[in-house]
Amino acid sequence: MENLPFPLKLLSASSLNAPSSTPWVLDIFLTLVFALGFFFLLLPYLSYFHCDDPPSPSPGKRKCPVGRRRRPRGRMKNHSLRAGRECPRGLEETSDLLSQLQSLLGPHLDKGDFGQLSGPDPPGEVGERAPDGASQSSHEPMEDAAPILSPLASPDPQAKHPQDLASTPSPGPMTTSVSSLSASQPPEPSLPLEHPSPEPPALFPHPPHTPDPLACSPPPPKGFTAPPLRDSTLITPSHCDSVALPLGTVPQSLSPHEDLVASVPAISGLGGSNSHVSASSRWQETARTSCAFNSSVQQDPLSRHPPETCQMEAGSLFLLSSDGQNVVGIQVTETAKVNIWEEKENVGSFTNQMTPEKHLNSLGNLAKSLDAEQDTTNPKPFWNMGENSKQLPGPQKCSDPRLLQESFWKNYSQLFWGLPSLHSESLVANAWVTDRSYTLQSPPFLFNEMSNVCPIQRETTMSPLLFQAQPLSHRQPFISSTPQFLPTPMAQAEAQAHLQSSFPVLSPAFPSLIKNTGVACPASQNKVQALSLPETQHPEWPLLRKQLEGRLALPSRVQKSQDVFSVSTPNLPQESLTSILPENFPVSPELRRQLEQHIKKWIIQHWGNLGRIQESLDLMQLRDESPGTSQAKGKPSPWQSSTSTGESSKEAQKVKFQLERDLCPHLGQILGETPQNLSRDMKSFPRKVLGVTSEESERNLRKPLRSDSGSDLLRCTERTHIENILKAHMGRNLGQTNEGLIPVRVRRSWLAVNQALPVSNTHVKTSNLAAPKSGKACVNTAQVLSFLEPCTQQGLGAHIVRFWAKHRWGLPLRVLKPIQCFKLEKVSSLSLTQLAGPSSATCESGAGSEVEVDMFLRKPPMASLRKQVLTKASDHMPESLLASSPAWKQFQRAPRGIPSWNDHGPLKPPPAGQEGRWPSKPLTYSLTGSTQQSRSLGAQSSKAGETREAVPQCRVPLETCMLANLQATSEDVHGFEAPGTSKSSLHPRVSVSQDPRKLCLMEEVVSEFEPGMATKSETQPQVCAAVVLLPDGQASVVPHASENLVSQVPQGHLQSMPTGNMRASQELHDLMAARRSKLVQEEPRNPNCQGSCKSQRPMFPPIHKSEKSRKPNLEKHEERLEGLRTPQLTPVRKTEDTHQDEGVQLLPSKKQPPSVSHFGENIKQFFQWIFSKKKSKPAPVTAESQKTVKNRSCVYSSSAEAQGLMTAVGQMLDKKMSLCHAHHASKVNQHKQKFQAPVCGFPCNHRHLFYSEHGRILSYAASSQQATLKSQGCPNRDRQIRNQQPLKSVRCNNEQWGLRHPQILHPKKAVSPVSPPQHWPKTSGASSHHHHCPRHCLLWEGI
C-alpha cells in the first residue's frame, strides 16, 4: 500500500509540482478574503429584508433572515435604504469575481495540474448533483458560508504555501475513524468524506463521509486507502471526532461527476450559488450523527460487487488516460479487498470499545493472522489483523447465512426468556456447525422440557460458527444495538454442568460420547475462543452462577444427600474422563482441568439420582416378590434393602443415563399405581427402628461405596434420612394428634416423602386402620406404621379409636336426642295430672327413665366429674368462671353420647348402676317436706326441663348453685313467709332441678343445633342463678331472668305446649308477681342495691342503655298517664300474654330450633321497649277492684289502637305472638278460675298478692280476647271508651296502696352475693309520690 505504481507517480509529480499553481491560488485567497469582508459589512443590513419582498436578482434577498432587530429611526432609515440598494450591486460583483475564478480554474485543470483525480465542473451540474437532503436553495445567504471560510484567514504556515500543500501527501499510516451515512440516503452523488483532492479539504474541511461507491447500488464498505502521494501533508480541521485522512484517500469507485463535485465544492458554489457552502455545514451535522452510529450499518461485501464492475466504473474517469485508468482500477480493486477485512476488524474494535475489559483479550489469542495462501478446509479467524494486515484471506467455506441468521435469533431470544441455565446449551448447540449441515434446521429449544431431537449432526471436523467472516457481516446490522451475548467457555462449562445436574434428563445430542460411565458431555461444554461479553456487560451472570452453584434447581433432600455422595465418590474409570475430552480439542490445560472437575462433579450428582431410581425399582420388586417377609404384631420388619442382587445392578446400568426414557414410566408406576393390599405394600416398604444410634448412622454413611453395592448404600442413607424426617415430624405433630386432629395429615406427609404410595388413597388407608375394635386398630397401626416409636404408635392408635367412635356415634346421637326429649315431654305432661301422688314415685320414674336413656345413649360415667362441679358450686363459684373452666367444658361435652373407650379393649357401654346422675334427694328437696310440695316439684321439673331450650349455659350451674344455697337461705325464707304460704313459695325454685336428665338432654340438643346461643347466655349467668338461688330479698332476680329468657323462647314451642305446662307456669307466675312487687317497693331506699346495679352494668349494656335513654321524669308521670292511657292497653295485653310464656319458661332451656337466633333478637328488642314504657306507668290498682279488672279485660282486647302499637313493636312480634295466643285461647279460658287463690307468702300486703293473681288471670283472658279479635278483625271501640273511667280509678287506687306500705321496701342485704341486674328500673328516692314500679303493676305483670 505504501509503494505506488510507476505511472501514477509520474502523473502526480508532473501535475502537482507545476510552477503556475502558486499565483492562481493566491488570487483565489485574496478574492475570497475580499468577498468575506464585504459580506460582513453588508450582513447587518441584510437582516431587515423580509421574505415577502419582491424577488430581486440577488440571491440573498430570497432567504428569510435569521433574526430581526428593531428598525432604526431617524438617520438609520436613510442609511438602511442606501445599504439596501448597494447590497445587490455588491453581491453581483462578488458573483462576477467568482465566475472569473472558476473560468481561470477550468483551463488550468484541463492542462493537467489536477488531472489525476479532479477537474472542473460547470456550476449547473454542481447544483444538479447536490444531494436532496444535504443541500439548500441556490440562493443561500452568505452568512452560512462565513464559518466555513473563516479558517482560511488564519496564518497557517502551510496555508501560505499552497503548492506544498497540494504536492506533498503525507506518507504516514492511515488513521481514520470509519463512519458512514445511513443506507437510506438516496443514491445521488453526494459530498464525499474522504476527498481525492488535497486542496478542497484545506479550504473547506468537510466531515468524514463515505460516498456512494457504485452508482445506483447499495453502499460498499466505508472506504479504502489509495496509494499515498509523495511528500504530501494535510491538516484538516477535525469534525465529529474524525481523524484527518491523507491526500491519497480515494473512494473505491467514484463516478466522474462525483469526483468533480468533490474536488471544488465550495468554489463552484460561490460561482453560481451558495448551496454547497450550506451543504457543507449540513454534512457536518450529518457526519456528527453518523459518528455515533459508526458501526450500525455495515456495507455489503465485495462478493456482491465483483472487481470487474469496480474496475469498469473506475476506468470511466474521462480525465485519466488509459494507463492511468487501469492503474486506478487495479488499485481500487486491491484496496477494496483490504478494506473489507479492515471493516470487520473495526467491528471487532467497536465491540472492544463497548466492553471495558476487552473481551477479545480475555479470551486470549483467538486465531492467527490472515494468510493469503491458507487452506480452504482450515479457515482462520479474522480478528488479529494487526500482525499481518497485508495478507488477504482466501475463500472460506461458510455455512448458509439464512440458517445461521435464523438460529442466532432463536438463541438470542432465548437468552432473555426461560431458564438461564439453558442458554449456554441452546447457543453452543448451534455454534458448532459442520461442513455438511447447511440445510439442517435447528429446532427451537423447549424450556421445562427435554427435546429428543438432535439439534445438529456431530462430525469429526467442526468449524466454529463465529469464525466465519461472511455470516458476521450479514448478522451485524441486526444486532448492532444489542451486543452479542455469548458466554465464555468457563461460564458455559459451569452452566452446562449445573444444567445437567439440575435436570436428570440428558439430551442424546452426542450419543457417541456416552461410554462406560454413560456421561454425556457434549462439545458445547468445551467451547473455546468464542466471542462473548464479560460479566460487567451482563451483571446477571454472577447471580446466575451463584444460583447454579447453589443448586437451586435441586430438591432439598437431593441437596442434603449430595453431601453424602461427596463423602464417598464412586470409583469411576479414568479412561471415561479422558474420553470425554478429545486430545486434539483446542483448549488450554487449565481450562481442560476445570472442565474435568465439573464433569466429575456432574457424575457424582447424577450418581445419586440413579441410586434413587434404582431404589424405587428395588422397592417395586420387593412388593411383588417378597410380600410376607416383614413381621406383624407391631414389630418392625428387618431392612429389606440387602436383597438387591447383581440383576438389579444390571437394571441400574440400563437405566443409568437414559433418564429421559425411563423417568416418566417409573414415576407413573410409583405415583399412579393403587396398591391392592395396604398391609402388603407397607410390609414390603423398607423400614427401620427409629432408635438407631448416631454412631450407627454415621458408620453407614461413611461406608465406602463400591461399584456393585453403591445402590445399597444410597438406599440406606435415603431411608435413614426419610425416617429421621418422619421422626421429627411425628414429634412435632404428636401434641396435635392427641388434641383430636385427623391422623391423615401425618400419613400424607409420610407418603409424600416416600413417594411410594398415592396421596389420594390416604383416606381409604386410614379407614382400614380404624378397625371396629381397639385391639385390631392397634395391631394394624403397628403393622403399617412400625417405623414409629411404641409410644407414638400407642397414642396414634388411641386417637384413631376416639376419632372412629366420635364419627360413629355422632349422627345417631343427633337423631336420638330430640326423640328422647319428646318422650320425656310426654311423660312430664302425664305427671301433671297426678299432683296428689307421692314424690317418691316421681323420683323413681325419673330415675328409671334416666337409666333407660343412659343405656340407650351409652353415656360415660361422669359421677366424679359432677361431684367436682357440685363442690365448686357449693363454694359459690361464679357461673361465668364455672362455665369457662375446663371441668365445666368437659362436663358439657360428656353427655354427648361418646362411648367410653379403652386402648386395649373393645367399646362397652357403662353399666346401669354406674350411670352418673343427680341424686334423687336433692332433686326432690323441699323445705317443708310436704307431699303437695313434692308433687308440685314433680310437675314443675318436667316443664322447667322442657323450657331449658332457651339459654344453654344455665344447665348445671343453675342446679348446683340452687342445691348449694337452699339450706343456707331456708331460715331467711321462713322469716319472710306469711302463714299458709310458706310451702308453696319455694315450689318453683326447687322444681327447677327436678328432672336433670331431661335438662342435660335438652342442653345437648341445643348445643348441636344452636352453638351461637351459648355466647349470648354466658353474659347472663348470675341472672339465671338468681332465679332459684335467692329466696327473699334478692328474689327480684327471678322476674328479670324470666324476662330475658322469655325473649329467647321460640314461639313455635309455645304453640305446641300442653295444658299441664300452663298450669305449672301459672304457679311460677304467682311467685314472680309477688317478688316483683317487693323488689320495686324496696328499691328506692336501697342504695346498695342501686350500687350493685351499677356494678353489673357491663353484663347487661343493651337493656340498661335502652331503659336509661327512655326513662321519663317522675314529674311527668301524670301527663304521660293521660296521653298514653289508651295506647298502653295493647302493650299490657301483649305483656300479659307474654307472661303466660314466662311462667312456662321460667328457667332456661338448652335447646332452641334454628329459628330462635333471629326471632329471639326481635323479642329482646321488644322487651327493651316495654321496659322503658313501664317506668312511665301510673300507680297500680289495688285488690279491691277485682271485679273492675275482670271487666277491663274486654276493654283491653277491644282496643282499636292495639293494632297501631303492634305495628310499632314489629311485624315479627305481631305474627308470632298472635298465632301463639290464638292457639291457646280456649285452654286459658278453661283454667282461668283455678288459679285465683293467693300463692305468694310474703309479709307484704296480702291484697296486693291476691290482686297480682287476678292480674295473671286477667292476662290470660286478655290474650284469649286478643286472639278472638285478631281472627275476627273487628275491634269494639265503644266498649273501650265505656271502660276507660274504671281503669283510671283502679290505677289511682293502686297508687294509694303503694304509699300505704313503705316498710316492704327494706330487704335483707346479705342474702346472696348475686345482686340485681343493672337493667332493673330505678325509681328516684326524692319522689315520695310515686314509689311503685310497673313490675308489680297489673298492667305489666306479663313481662
Swiss-Prot record:
Keyword hit for Transcription regulation: no
Sequence intervals crossing the membrane: 23-43
Coiled coil: none
Keywords: Differentiation, Membrane, Spermatogenesis, Transmembrane, Transmembrane helix
Biased composition (Basic residues): 60-82
Gene Ontology terms describing biological process: cell differentiation; spermatogenesis
Source lineage: Eukaryota, Metazoa, Chordata, Craniata, Vertebrata
Pfam families: DUF4599, FAM75
Main subcellular localisation: membrane
Name by which UniProt lists this protein: Spermatogenesis-associated protein 31A6
GO cellular component: membrane
InterPro entries assigned: SPATA31, SPATA31F3-like
Membrane topology (UniProt): Single-pass membrane protein
PANTHER family: ACROSOME-SPECIFIC PROTEIN, SPERMATOGENESIS-ASSOCIATED PROTEIN 31A1-RELATED
Biased composition (Pro residues): 198-222
Subcellular location: Membrane
Function: May play a role in spermatogenesis.
Basic and acidic residues compositional bias, start-end: 1104-1123, 1133-1142
Comp. bias (Polar residues): 165-178, 627-647, 923-944
Disordered: region residues: 55-88, 106-235, 624-654, 895-951, 1080-1156, 1309-1331
Family: Belongs to the SPATA31 family.
Keyword Transmembrane: yes
